[in-house]
Amino acid sequence: MILNIKNKAKSYEVNIGGANQWSGTNIIEKDMLLNMITKYFSKEKYKEYDGKLECTIYSNKEELGRGYYTVYQFNSREELFSQLKIGKNTYMFKYISNRVLSEYNTMIGMEKISDELTNIYKYLNEEIFQEFDNVELDFEISKLFNIIQDSIIFDKSGNDIHNLSIFELIKNNIKLIEKLEKNSGNKVLVIFKNIDHLLTKEEYKKIYKLATNLSDITNMQFIFTLSIDGYCIVNENNIEEILVVNDEEITLPEYERIREFVQSNYPINIELNDKWLIEN
């Protein structure tokens, strides 16, 4: 889908497909575009200092509502860690809370805990508080959920999650978002900025493959920004999902158009095949 992003100064055109790669050396421009997209679909009110981010986004000349996408953006290692922790408003806490409230077996377990606490408090009131005048102990069942909020995430060896590799953090955050949005019906856009500064080339290939597979079977789409040579994955199926951001923004055309152009304009002594075309 082609997005036309218009602010007071300029109009931009980007293609959003399955697993998008934004390459090129203009990191500032890429960050600005992604921040504009994230702010727009956040539905948050623009503040005075958001002037550069304020925009309107269209597709096929129709204005997209600000709730069209649910956007998740990761900018750093610290953000990857923070969302896997259980804390107020973290993705992990939302996921676990939703599961606790929706799983029958979990609710049965919570009721059993409530029954046991009721017996404990009954004993305390009968044996310890019987001599007090009009005073009893009790508990609020809603406070049981505080136990979950106070839980701690560890790796399978019992170590703090700060021992997880960046690759594991990125993969787990992707899987967490998949679980969170599985039945939401939302169109989901997951953004990883400067992922080439976090992963090796081989690790990035695995994450890109995971993103591609998920975009084929779920409501999730991805944007990865890259600036280091050799990271961008190019094949005849993903050409249109590559955006080059240097002085200008260039969305690559479909593979067959590139092939036809090269055949018409390159010297005839070059042996043209798919492998040569992709590598060059």
What does each model-identified segment do?
Residues 31-35, 199-207, 232-237:
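A short acidic (Asp/Glu
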Residues 186, 212-279:
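The catalytic "switch" region of P-loop NTPases
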Residues 151-205:
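Conserved helicase/translocase P-loop NTPase motor core
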Residues 100-170:
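Conserved P-loop NTPase mechanochemical-coupling segment
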Residues 23-27, 191-197, 226-228:
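Structural motif
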Residues 18-24, 186-192, 220-222:
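Generic beta-sheet signal
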Residues 1-69, 86-107, 111, 278-280:
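Glycine-rich P-loop/Walker A and Walker A-like loops and their local beta1-loop-alpha1 context
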Residues 13-17, 177-187, 215-218:
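Flexible, charged surface loops at secondary-structure boundaries
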